[in-house]
A protein has these predicted regions:
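Short glycine/proline-rich turn/loop motifs
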Residues: 22-32, 76-81, 159-164
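Metal-dependent active-site segment of extracytoplasmic phospho-/sulfohydrolases and closely related
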Residues: 93-132
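Active-site His/acidic residue clusters
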Residues: 7-8, 47-89, 125-130
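C-terminal cap/loop subdomain of S1 sulfatases and analogous C-terminal strand-loop tails that border
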Residues: 124-147, 164-168, 172, 177-239
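The substrate-binding groove and active-site-proximal loops of carbohydrate-active enzymes
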Residues: 29-41, 80-93
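Beta-strand elements within well-structured catalytic alpha/beta cores of enzymes
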Residues: 58-64, 91-94, 98, 115-120, ...
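Loop/turn elements at helix/coil->beta-strand transitions in domains of secreted/extracellular proteins
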Residues: 55-61, 110-116, 152-154, 214-217, ...
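Core domains of carbohydrate- and sulfate-ester-processing enzymes
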Residues: 1-29, 127-154, 236-239
Length: 239
């Protein structure tokens, strides 16, 4: 793993070729190895700096936290906090990350004018937390990369003060693909007809304006580890 900024690998050793070694977690040709337990804190700090630098103009921040992804390496100050191993500690550290971003938005009085979405790109791996009696996917069948619900039904939390009703819920089935149309709608940008034709604007649903027809006619998922795919329409799912 390496740091990448503006499409460039950071910390390259002068004159050396970068090569993968071992189990692909380490590279040759890097001058300074990254401190794995500081990855989360570093990313959170850079996200805060980005907000500081753009506080006076509209901005889009995509923050793909690596906290609860392997390798599970929570910061030293989080070790043992959860009483549920590295996974639980990492979940708590992620919660701190989100709180830090919220605090930064409030610091610049941007919390009223910012659409914040927290979600995941896949379901959890169920082995994490199992020894502590915890089921990462709750009652859902399957796990990450599975065609079943545990593979792709994930939490989706959105906040836009004054626009999204507090404590509201929706039963609509949506996809991460819908972020494109939703972000453009929130920014007041018209999405060209040929761009992301399978992306749907979720803002009306999020704001409590119920639609006469579903947001999506159907949702298609493909399993990474098998040839299976599923088509979900309303309460029905064909595999």
């Amino acid at each position: 793993y390496v740091w990448v900024e503006n499409d460039k690998i950071m910390g390259r050793a002068p004159g050396e070729v970068i090569e993968i070694e071992g189990n692909q977690k380490e590279l040759k040709g890097i001058e300074h190895k990254r401190e794995t337990t500081q990855i989360t804190a570093t990313l959170a700090q850079r996200a805060g700096q980005f907000i500081d630098q753009n506080k006076d103009r509209p901005f889009f921040l995509y923050y793909p936290a690596c906290t609860v992804h392997t390798p599970l390496e929570p910061g030293a100050q989080w070790k043992g906090k959860s009483k549920m191993g590295d996974y639980g500690d990492s979940v708590q550290e992620f919660d701190w990350q989100v709180g830090r971003i919220l605090s930064k938005l409030s610091q610049h009085n941007l919390h009223q004018d910012t659409l914040l979405i927290v979600t995941s790109d896949n379901g959890a791996l169920t082995r994490f937390g199992r020894e502590y009696g915890h089921s990462s996917n709750g009652p859902l069948r399957g796990e990450k990369a599975s065609i079943y619900e545990g593979g792709h039904r994930v939490p989706f939390i959105a906040r836009w003060l004054g626009k999204i009703p507090v404590a509201s819920e929706s039963r609509e089935i949506v996809s991460l693909v819908d972020f494109i149309a939703t972000a453009c709608a929130a920014a007041g940008v018209e999405l060209p007809a040929h761009v992301a034709p399978d992306s749907h604007n979720l803002l009306p649903e999020m704001m409590g304006v119920r639609q006469a027809v579903p947001v999506r006619e159907a949702t298609v998922c493909v399993s990474k580890f098998s040839a299976h795919l599923s088509i979900q329409q309303g309460p029905w799912k064909m595999i």
